[in-house]
Design a protein with these regions (language model features):
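N-terminal beta1-alpha1 ligand-phosphate binding loop
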Residues: 1-33
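Short hydrophobic segments within beta-strands
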Residues: 6-8, 38, 134-136
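A short, flexible beta-alpha/helix-coil linker loop
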Residues: 9-11, 138-142, 177-178
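Glycine-rich phosphate/pyrophosphate-binding loop and the adjoining helix
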Residues: 25, 143-178
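A short beta-strand-loop structural module common to alpha/beta enzyme folds
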Residues: 33-45, 173-176
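Helix-loop-strand module that forms the ligand-binding subsite of alpha/beta enzymes
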Residues: 56-156
Length: 178
């Protein structure tokens, strides 16, 4: 199995996230899996801030998509800051996991001028692949939960609003204070 890891933590050497990444790579390699690591802070070419007016997307976006297409698993690793993943990882998601490649919309009533903006998502290039999320929180669990419908907003947003749109099967690994 080929696993594409997208690592988005600023401390690429000695953080808890780096330990998760390195341990995962070591264990997965021992099991015979191939690893394709995208270390966003160490990439030679950095993505510009997302701008929908840039069309077609930069070549690096197409390269990332090709790497994902050649993988069986996408594994996002990052920390939680202000109830979001790091900006560099969010920007990567905005560019790479974008509609028409990652998912598209199908109209409820095709050809209707009245319902042309109403529809449902149709998974794209990553449909059926496994999506793993590792998010570290740096504090006790209770500080990120309010025991309501909106518990764990960062995870819900990535899982439901990103990976589910793309038709991915998801697994979530969370770490609080250690």
């Amino acid at each position: 199995m080929k696993i594409c890891i997208v690592y988005g933590h600023h401390n690429t050497k000695s953080s808890f996230n780096a330990a998760i990444r390195d341990t995962f790579i070591e264990e997965a390699s021992l099991c015979g899996h191939q690893i394709d690591l995208i270390n966003l802070f160490d990439e030679e070419v950095q993505l510009p801030f997302y701008n929908s007016d840039i069309n077609p997307p930069p070549q690096i976006v197409l390269d990332y998509r090709k790497r994902l297409e050649n993988s069986d698993v996408m594994f996002l690793i990052g920390s939680c800051h202000n109830l979001r993943m790091p900006t560099i990882l969010e920007n990567w998601i905005d560019w790479v996991l974008h509609p028409k490649w990652f998912f598209s919309y199908r109209a409820l009533v095709p050809g209707s001028k009245y319902f042309k903006n109403y529809g449902y998502p149709v998974p794209g290039a990553m449909n059926g692949k496994l999506g793993l999320i590792s998010m570290t929180y740096g504090g006790p669990m209770v500080t990120y939960f309010n025991f309501s419908l909106f518990d764990n907003i960062p995870y819900r947003r990535i899982k439901k609003a990103v990976m589910n749109l793309g038709g991915m099967v998801t697994k979530y690994i969370r770490f609080y204070s250690v």
